[in-house]
Amino acid sequence: MKKFVSLLFTLSFVFMTQSCNVNKGLAGLSPQQALTGVQALLNGSSKSALKGFGGNVLKNAVMQKAMPKGLSTITSLLGNSSEGNKALGLLNGALGSAVPNVASSLLSNVTKNIPAADALSLLKGGDTGATDFLKKTAGKKLAAALLPAITKQLTDNGGLSAITSALGSKASSLIGNGKPSLADLVTSGATDGLFAMMGNAEKAERNNPTDPILKEIFGK
């Protein structure tokens, strides 16, 4: 029992020490310093997330969790045949081309224009506070920009027709006919997946910062 109490005391002390270090780093920041920190946090998180779109992003666990149910069903069905797997490859390729090209500049511009007065509250906003703000501020704008880009990529590389063909008779019950189009589903999944991956990257950077600015802010 004494060992258990001692362990609890030690863990509590460590937690309080870490919290104090973070608060100490945040307490003395000017609005401009806080803004520099938020921008470093978001720029690093977005770069990390966008790298994930360079490979087989549909196999990314975070991406899969963020997908709308309709897209998750489609990708699962496609994985059951060689024709479907080829179609998945085209879908991955379309995402890898469209998402980084559109999202990189858009997110960078939004990040540059974050008001300095909001910066400190974003740093104090929890593990994914900055990403949550960015999603709320730019999520709809990003989705609107991604939709035509993804549609074009899937049209140009033959992905739309390949996916429809691979789904066969099930296609009509999954896409269109009052349901979201395939491009809409993919855009929704790409948008939510990107922000989910950014949130993971932000959390990791807060807990174990690699950026010199963030090391100072988060007391690591």
Task: Name each model feature, range by range.
Residues M1-F4:
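Positively charged n-region of N-terminal signal peptides that target proteins for export
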Residues G89-Q153:
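Mid-length scaffold segments of soluble, non-membrane domains
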Residues A27-L78:
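Post-signal-peptide N-terminal segment of Sec-exported extracytoplasmic proteins
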Residues N21-K24:
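Bacterial signal peptide processing site
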Residues K141, A145-G189:
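An amphipathic alpha-helical core segment
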Residues G189-K220:
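A cross-kingdom marker for long, charged
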Residues S6-V14:
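Hydrophobic helical h-region of N-terminal Sec-dependent signal peptides
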Residues F15-S19:
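C-terminal motif of bacterial Sec signal peptides marking the signal peptidase cleavage site
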